[in-house]
């Protein structure tokens, strides 16, 4: 006999909705030739001068993934690398004028995907959901814990 569940399967609910939201985001951004990672790099590089390493951390990307992402942005003429004025070893990701235009469009797309998901809920439920998720993300579930077998996780923020 299977054990009796005493709580809703929060892991499934969060994983499933997150996965579906990511697929919708990928499809929507794909229409303008971007990935979610490319969007993340463009938007955060426009906020302030940031190094490739800083942007990788914000986007939860390893070095290889970040290099591939920036290579794609360079190839598309949306961003470039330039030396840091304060650290010879670091590279600043500089967004081009075309990249800034694409970033504004991609942010509209991202906002639209989020708006569409939230619009499927009544106003009162939407506000409660967002407050609860924000409380979890900045409180009890803010940081992962060490584990002998690392949990695979999706890219964060961005």
Regions found by a protein language model. Give the residues of each.
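Amphipathic alpha-helical interaction segments
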Residues: 12, 16, 40, 128-131, ...
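A conserved beta-turn-beta hairpin within the catalytic core of GNAT-like acetyltransferases
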Residues: 16, 51, 87-89
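C-terminal regulatory/oligomerization modules of transcriptional regulators
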Residues: 1-5, 124-158
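Short alpha-helical transmembrane interface motifs in multi-pass membrane proteins
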Residues: 7-11, 99
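N-terminal helix-turn-helix DNA-binding core of bacterial DNA-binding proteins
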Residues: 12, 19, 23-65, 144-150
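Charged, amphipathic alpha-helical coiled-coil/dimerization segments
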Residues: 22, 71-138
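Carboxylate-rich helix-loop segments that flank metal/cofactor sites and access channels
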Residues: 53, 69-72
